[in-house]
Amino acid sequence: MDKIITEDEQKAAVKILERLISVPSYNQPAEEGAPFGKGIRNALDEMMKICDELGFKTYEDPDGYYGYAEVGSGDKIFGVICHLDTVPAGDLGKWKHDPFKGTVINDAVYGRGSQDDKGPGIAALYAVKALMDQGYHFNQRIRFIY
């Protein structure tokens, strides 16, 4: 099989990751519709928008506990669990790079969630998107659970 993920697609994935990193999503007091705080709810809303834009079917729990995006058909579900919360950034003055920007240096992305778990979640999502773009038919559902 030829390269499935092109350089342009990789750049697009990094831009999406930067977009998601820009949403501060550390645990805050619960609010109505945001059981883990407004930041985490905002990250869930943004992730669902991203998944919609990429062609996934989405569902978001109205109470804000979870959402998912899926592709494929059939009775079986292959689940990919991702989380969008991060630890607080602490003293912003001690950061070399803005923790909520998603700074790319030498092909590495710096920012809250870039390694745990926003970055890996976007990588997995784009791997499936690349297969979708190649016309691959999934005979079971692949569900990304957030």
PLM regions with names:
Residues 1-79, 86-90:
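N-terminal helical capping/dimerization or prosegment-like subdomains
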